[in-house]
Amino acid sequence: MPYQYPALTPEQKKELSDIAHRIVAPGKGILAADESTGSIAKRLQSIGTENTEENRRFYRQLLLTADDRVNPCIGGVILFHETLYQKADDGRPFPQVIKSKGGVVGIKVDKGVVPLAGTNGETTTQGLDGLSERCAQYKKDGADFAKWRCVLKIGEHTPSALAIMENANVLARYASICQQNGIVPIVEPEILPDGDHDLKRCQYVTEKVLAAVYKALSDHHIYLEGTLLKPNMVTPGHACTQKFSHEEIAMATVTALRRTVPPAVTGITFLSGGQSEEEASINLNAINKCPLLKPWALTFSYGRALQASALKAWGGKKENLKAAQEEYVKRALANSLACQGKYTPSGQAGAAASESLFVSNHAY
């Protein structure tokens, strides 16, 4: 085996590791506010609000300027390109607002999924071209971590070996480019909850996918201490008739992670995958209470599961700003407790919090 030429200096490694640790400090997780213009259009449409740049800015500002109760809950915020360059009403750029509240600024860098020809509707993710230059610019503009989402589907013949290998490789290339530019990569191989598969099948597929991802990261000389993983929880498919307890979901999830994710990885920030706000908090809490050894921080990187009630409360009306922020603060506090295994559902969750956020074949 040839000598491995070091990809990163000790200083670069320390910077990456420090950033990753800040994002997943105890009690902290990530607000995913990086919906593309097309995705946010659906959210705004659901409350009868026009998808204009100002409405998008106002809504993101609502989340980013919630009062200081969220500061100990939110370690990082993932933004969409447009949002990184928008400003709050007081003239402060959004990255400055996030940093003033102790958060790390993140940016979505992938360019969406594209079909893999010759597969049964499987995809890979595009966006590697020019990524190094974009990362260098984003770093200058205040971003310290990034996100790239790959999508896999469970079916009779999926995910195929080709889809698993291709997506693992593209995640590794992305991670390598980020680290060279001082940006911590969040590696997101999402296995969609679509389908009628049971818990065991999801666990099996999750293990196979994560094993392939970490083999690719090793092949590409990724510094694991300077990365975060954003996986799905192991859950039954949405059309599965059998019901599983939160404890069973937690056990299957932690078991799959223990079998595949090296302890060197700083943190695991779960995606909510269309679970209701309440369900996402309860499952995260159960995962943290699972009686197995867990060497990584296990926390949240939630979009809809932090925003659904806030979005409804806002309803596109400026006068509802405070009420909407209150809903967001509630979910942030709940998930901050859940990532420490200290969340007790109050039974007072509003209707919006208990509503399933599942979207078939979810494109982000």
Swiss-Prot record:
Q: Under which name does UniProt file this protein?
A: Fructose-bisphosphate aldolase A
The cross-link described as Glycyl lysine isopeptide (Lys-Gly) (interchain with G-Cter in SUMO2) comes at: K42
**N6-malonyllysine: which positions carry it?**
K111, K312
**InterPro entries in UniProt:** Aldolase_I_AS, Aldolase_TIM, FBA_I
| Taxonomic path | Eukaryota, Metazoa, Chordata, Craniata, Vertebrata
Residues that the record marks as modified (N6-acetyllysine) are K42, K108, K111, K330
Q: Which organism is it from?
A: Homo sapiens (Human)
UniProt keyword annotations, A-Z: Acetylation, Cytoplasm, Disease variant, Glycogen storage disease, Glycolysis, Hereditary hemolytic anemia, Hydroxylation, Isopeptide bond, Lyase, Phosphoprotein, Schiff base, Ubl conjugation
Residues found modified as Phosphotyrosine:
Y5
